[in-house]
């Protein structure tokens, strides 16, 4: 089988995660600045057998969409143009940042590493992807 690439899209940065070939386990990749996102995706898709994208769906506790969703829709439109043969799926990302912070806090990392926003973003992407993979 092939791999799935997950993206936790943010205003400044995007966290990435990738699945194994069996599409059963999610692994964190990197967090990149938004200005580098398309080049990063290009590099990943050239070096890995990606067949699907999973992009976080930012909802509030009351199930409303965050304003960031408008920006994400533009991002998805560009991804569809650049990768017309790859599937694009959405996954609810409610509480992923909070869960990522909790997981990091329970780790053996030093405090400065635990507060690293880039680490939180890529762990959030991993949580989004693992949630998606459980449904396959």
Question: Where in the sequence are the language-model features?
Answer:
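Phosphate- and other anionic-substrate recognition elements at nucleic-acid/protein interfaces
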Residues: 2-7, 11-12, 17-136
């Amino acid at each position: 089988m092939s791999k799935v690439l997950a993206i936790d899209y943010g205003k400044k940065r995007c966290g990435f995660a990738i699945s194994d070939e069996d599409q059963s386990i999610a692994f964190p990749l990197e967090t990149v600045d938004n200005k580098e996102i398309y080049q990063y995706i290009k590099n990943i898709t050239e070096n890995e057998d990606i067949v699907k994208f999973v992009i976080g769906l930012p909802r509030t506790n009351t199930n409303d969409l965050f304003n960031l969703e408008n920006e994400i829709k533009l991002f998805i439109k560009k991804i569809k143009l650049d990768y017309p043969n790859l599937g694009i799926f959405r996954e609810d990302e409610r509480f992923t940042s909070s869960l990522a912070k909790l997981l990091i806090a329970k780790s053996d990392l030093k405090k400065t590493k635990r507060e690293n926003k880039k680490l939180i973003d890529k762990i959030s992407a991993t949580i989004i992807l693992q949630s998606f993979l459980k449904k396959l």
